[in-house]
Amino acid sequence: MGLRTSVLLVLLASSPGLTFAKTTLPIVASHHQDVMIASASLTDYTRSDPYASDGRPRSIMVSGFYPTTQCRRKKIEPYMPPATASFMDTKFGAYGLPNGSFQSLGLDTCMTPAKRGGCSKDLPVVLFSGALATSRHLYNAMLQNIAATGYIVLSIDHPYDADMVEFPDGTIVTGVDIESDAEIELALDTRVADIEFVSKQMKNASAIKDLLPGYAGGKNALKMAVVGHSLGGAAAAGAMMSITSLKGGVNLDGSMFGPVLTTGFNDPFMLMGHENKTQATDPSWKTIWPNLTGWKKEFEVKHSAHYSFSDLPLVISALGLDGKLPAQVGELLGSIEGRRMTGLTTTYVAAFLDMVLKGGKEDAFSKAGSRFTEVDEVA
């Protein structure tokens, strides 16, 4: 956590502009659809921000990803907004990434859908929460791939929890130190409240207009699931316990905390961990397992590490840096090539979402296992 302050000082001192994106991160999902992306700031006036000393209402940043079957005009969108990209260049420069790496990246997006069809299609919604001290933008490519399989995805940045959140008016909120049990509990509770707030925005015409321009809405938008990585996975479990509108949840590599461990819930839930992260090694997974009384599965991904479930492996592969970075990067990202890891995560998450939100068959997991032999079904 101490890296945040020094990174911010470097960022403020340099403040470089975003260069033209030269490397496009690919959509590797098997069911390819063009995806539109938009971001908006949303404010929950019903609660105060627990991290702000002046009692201001809680404001968050959210990105919306939604597929279109008919795209009239495409655009290479910068992978991250300018200040965030500069911040990440400095942060991950410590791992050997060349300066300007994140500023050089782009996403192939749909800028203008066809007048008929396109983004007006009625689709289920996936809510996403990332890791502690991690920008939502470090999951943009993965979430674009999930959206391409036929879902609206709403990705949430949790200010003061994420290492940096950049708002449209130029405001930058940096993270606070979150280390003690009490601090983690506050962060978790705040995340669950953020997720609940965003889940209600599909009934808010103003929010939909900002996050999903051109989207007409429909009953399927009220079919929702939640996916989270790391602390976001813990938040996904907490949200499943408290938000009745959620039909299922996925925890990617996150240890869990709080009353959900003993209370549990009866809706579908999937655990996917990196190599050696299972019920046998994570007490929270072992504790919650018997209290998950609905459909459940646990998977272990061999040769993966904690941040394998982010865009970082794909970024490194797309930049041609596989095998060229310090050995300690493997402790962070594992050894699975980036396109394959993104495809693996997308395939398993989409199989779960199809099952709980679209009535898909459970045998999709067996088919995925045949393709991705790194994945072991633990339970």
Annotate each predicted stretch with a short phrase.
Residues 1-21:
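Fungal secretory targeting signals
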Residues 105-166, 277-279:
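Short substrate-entry loop that stabilizes the transition state in hydrolases
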Residues 160, 166-219:
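Alpha/beta-hydrolase active-site loop
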Residues 312-379:
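Alpha/beta-hydrolase-fold serine-hydrolase catalytic core, especially in secreted/extracellular enzymes
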Residues 20-126, 330-331, 338, 358:
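Domain-level recognition of soluble alpha/beta enzyme cores
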Residues 198-264:
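Primarily recognizes the serine-hydrolase "nucleophile elbow" in alpha/beta-hydrolase
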Residues 120, 247-309:
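The feature captures the conserved acid-bearing segment of alpha/beta-hydrolase catalytic domains
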Residues 68-69, 78-98, 137-177, 302:
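Active-site machinery of serine-nucleophile hydrolases
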